[in-house]
């Protein structure tokens, strides 16, 4: 029970941290782009990845973190995650440039639906529960309603926004798949992704001339701009780790819904701090519907977690009862069946072994030789029924179905 509580607290804490870091990074990046006209986005991405790679490598060499050294086998395990992570961050930065901050958040609110669909196709873990499905559909409808209130953005921003949602959903699902297929944790995943993506991002930053023209940017003379730039780099590293950790502990859909919950504050700050969008009635209605979907999702996930914990408690209950049974006490009482052959047969049985049978019954019912009473017999039968039910439940829960060769089984062997 204590481990279950710790797991829930850890999952909630990581989800909250992911929402805080993600929302802060979106606001600061939009502030850099809108207020200071900072357009060197590839440089931001390159410095974020290289900072994470150098920091984790230094901590690994000092022995402060348990991360295996980088190698080809390790890189091969996270190759798809590294590619999608790099592509997702690039598309996110480009969509922030072409869209207003509230409209960018509206696009991101479609992430749970896309993540759920890709997860069903890739992970093949079955359809989601009706509560989760209803929450995802309501959230997506709210995003579409809010998007109808703002169609003044850059067309390239809308294209990159759609692509960012698709790639981000695939990235989260692939993280969840990697967590099930490999033995490595989220810190190892971030280390491999950062080391693998840094050389490619360095080449891209020079190919886009961001690393060349960034030195002549006049905003470096403003200390506030420099502080915001450094904060974006550090918060970006923290957000990448919390994204991986939240997906490892919870799920891809839960991580995407964290973005939906934190977007309420992001939209509010975006409307107050930036004047590139006006809060229309459609936009406000969409945000309200979106928030309702988020609340329904939280309630549905809470009910699923509660039901799962009840199943685990029911499965663990017979083990505790078996441990309480002593060595000289049997789990149930054997009762003697009544005779079916009449009085003569019964008397013959008594003449042959009446005292012996009475002594056996006394030994079975009580180790001290006290005769059994009707109350103890009923209590023993109830306990035996309960134990039998729990044993059947454990067998059903732990059954693994195996493929059988029906041709060999049904083959008729010739008689000798």
Curated annotation (Swiss-Prot):
Catalytic activity: UDP-alpha-D-glucose(in) = UDP-alpha-D-glucose(out)
One Gene Ontology term, aspect cellular component: Golgi apparatus
Keyword Ribonucleoprotein assigned: no
Recorded GO MF terms: antiporter activity; protein-macromolecule adaptor activity; UDP-glucose transmembrane transporter activity
Regulation: Inhibited by proton uncouplers that directly abolish the proton electrochemical gradient.
InterPro entries assigned: TPT_transporter
Keywords: Cytoplasmic vesicle, Endoplasmic reticulum, Endosome, Membrane, Sugar transport, Synapse, Transmembrane, Transmembrane helix, Transport
Biased composition, class Gly residues, residue ranges: 339-352
Taxonomy, superkingdom: Eukaryota
An example Gene Ontology biological process: transmembrane transport
Principal localisation: membrane
Protein's cellular compartments: Cytoplasmic vesicle, Secretory vesicle, Synaptic vesicle membrane; Early endosome membrane; Endoplasmic reticulum membrane
PANTHER family to which the protein is assigned, alphabetical: SOLUTE CARRIER FAMILY 35 (PTHR11132)
UniProt subunit comment: Could interact with ATG14, BECN1 and PIK3C3 that form the PI3KC3-C1/AIC/autophagy initiation complex; enhancing the formation of the AIC and promoting autophagy.
Protein name (database record): Solute carrier family 35 member D3
Lineage: Eukaryota, Metazoa, Chordata, Craniata, Vertebrata
GN (gene name): SLC35D3
């Amino acid at each position: 029970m204590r481990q279950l509580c710790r797991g829930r607290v850890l999952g909630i804490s990581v989800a909250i941290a992911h929402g805080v870091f993600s929302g802060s990074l979106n606001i600061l990046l939009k502030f850099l782009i809108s207020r200071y006209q900072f357009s060197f986005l590839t440089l931001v991405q390159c410095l974020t990845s290289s900072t994470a790679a150098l920091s984790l490598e230094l901590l690994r060499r000092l022995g402060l973190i348990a991360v295996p050294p980088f190698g080809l086998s390790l890189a091969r395990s996270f190759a798809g995650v590294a590619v999608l992570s790099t592509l997702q961050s690039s598309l996110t930065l480009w969509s922030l440039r072409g869209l207003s901050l509230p409209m960018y958040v509206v696009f991101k609110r479609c992430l749970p639906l896309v993540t759920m669909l890709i997860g069903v196709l890739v992970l093949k873990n079955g359809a989601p529960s009706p509560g989760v499905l209803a929450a995802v559909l309501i959230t997506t409808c709210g995003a579409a309603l809010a998007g109808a209130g703002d169609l003044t953005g850059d067309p390239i921003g809308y294209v990159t926004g759609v692509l960012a949602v698709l790639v981000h959903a695939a990235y989260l699902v692939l993280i969840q798949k990697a967590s099930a297929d490999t033995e490595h944790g989220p810190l190892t995943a971030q280390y491999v992704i950062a080391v693998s993506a840094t050389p490619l991002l360095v080449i891209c930053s020079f190919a886009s001339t961001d690393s060349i023209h960034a030195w002549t940017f006049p905003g470096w003379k403003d200390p506030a701009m420099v502080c915001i730039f450094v904060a974006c780099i550090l918060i970006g590293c923290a957000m990448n780790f919390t994204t991986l950790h939240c997906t490892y502990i919870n799920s891809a859909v839960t991580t995407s819904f964290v973005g939906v919950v934190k977007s309420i504050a992001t939209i509010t700050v975006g409307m107050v701090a930036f004047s590139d969008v006006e809060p229309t009635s459609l936009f406000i209605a969409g945000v309200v519907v979106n928030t309702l979907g988020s609340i329904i999702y939280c309630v549905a996930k809470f009910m699923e977690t509660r039901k799962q914990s009840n199943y685990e408690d029911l499965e663990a209950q017979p083990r505790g009862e078996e441990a309480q049974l002593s060595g000289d006490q049997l789990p149930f009482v054997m009762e003697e069946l009544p005779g079916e052959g009449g009085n003569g047969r019964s008397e013959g049985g008594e003449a042959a072994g009446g005292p012996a049978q009475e002594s056996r019954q006394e030994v079975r019912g009580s180790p001290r030789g006290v005769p059994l009473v009707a109350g103890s017999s009923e209590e023993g039968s109830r306990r035996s029924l309960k134990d039998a039910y729990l044993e059947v439940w454990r067998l059903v829960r732990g059954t693994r179905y195996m493929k059988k060769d029906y041709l060999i089984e049904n083959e008729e062997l010739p008689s000798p």
